[in-house]
Amino acid sequence: MTTLRVLLHVAAHRDYELHSLDFSTAFLQGSLHEEIWLRRPPGFTGSFPSGTQWSLRRPVYGLRQAPREWHDTLRTTLAALGFAPSTADPSLFLRTDTSLPPFYILVYIDDLVFATADTAGLAYVKSELQKRHMCTDLGELRSYLGLQITRDRARRTITLTQSHMVQQVLQRFGFTYSSPQATPLSTRHSLSALPSDESVESSGPYPELVGCLIPEHMAAAKRVLRYLCSTSGMGLVLGGRSPVVLTGHADASWADDQATQRSSQGYTFSLGSGSVSWRATRSSSVLGSSCEAEIYAGAMAAQELRWLTYLLTDLGEPPRSPPVLYVDNKAMLALCREQRLEHRTKHIALRYFLARELQQRGQLRLAYVASEANTADVFTKALPPCDHQRFCTQLGLVPVLPHLLSS
């Protein structure tokens, strides 16, 4: 999904045409290279002796090789049309002929997104795909993988919403008209793991809702639904006329898990408008200080930043200057400025100092930001409503007009 958001941002910024195409029974259109034999299906009344084995000629749904064979078949077709996979993401295909306008194709199994300013080339590629495979031209991109996509070409922006999917979830669990909540988690709510010797409910609405068996979290799960009820009209705005500039924020919450004393880390990246990449995770071990937790968060963000740089380079938007990664811990910044041995940090594995290494290479610039302005803070802890809403606005989430949602 990160590649999709980055592609949509770049396409909106350049005012590209965005179209989509869907393949019918995609796995049946692949080519099978292995020799596979089947037993005769039960109930088949053909004139075959008992114990006859059948040779499978084409991939079928349920065959382990089917997804790979379909991807190889599609990749061969796109290569014949002049496209090659991106080095950053093999599901993104780039036009190899640099004398022609840029043309990008994003593949997710049997759903394709086309992004280009070459309308003639777009029509040609779609017609060739329809000649070689069973597929349907869906026209301009309106929805993709559960996302509703609305364009404002005058402002060169794209708004992503999931109001239809949210309403389906709320209706499924009977929360369509529930009391809304401004935040997904209360700052006063402390969640703990279920004791191993306590019996759990194996069926009912809670396992169906969150996919696990911790009944004491039911109130928190219901609060998430009420939060979705209050934010179903929000959308993520991408694109814009401002230059594409990669900027990131990273943050950590030290030892915030009361049961394990482990820390939470999070990051977010934007290209000038809404966030295109984000992540929230829990450390795999106990960390000794808030500085150490911030170093872990910085390393995680630096890995994503380096990959985003590769992806943007393939899309023709290489960073013109080192991308800035904002953090709110001055001790972590001091350690990354000077490579020195410290008694309290010498045990930290070198791989977690990736942010320092990239800064020394000139591929990244670390900068300080106050905690109240660090957007990644929303991924590390529950916040009061005013702070939560402020960070959501900084992430690019804005209210969407009702007529756009209905369309």
Give the label of every model feature segment.
Residues 7-8, 138-235, 370, 378-380:
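C-terminal reverse transcriptase regions that engage the nucleic-acid substrate
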Residues 81, 85-88, 113-166, 170-171, ...:
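Polymerase palm active-site segment centered on the conserved acidic dipeptide of motif C
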Residues 11-15, 226-252, 317-319:
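Structured nucleic-acid-interacting core domains from mobile-element enzymes and related host factors
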Residues 213, 248-291:
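RNase H-like nuclease fold core
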Residues 7, 22, 38, 62, ...:
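Mobile genetic element proteins and their domesticated derivatives, centered on retroelements
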Residues 1-106, 111-134:
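Metal/cofactor- and membrane transport-associated sequence elements
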Residues 245, 281-407:
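RNase H-like nuclease module associated with reverse transcription
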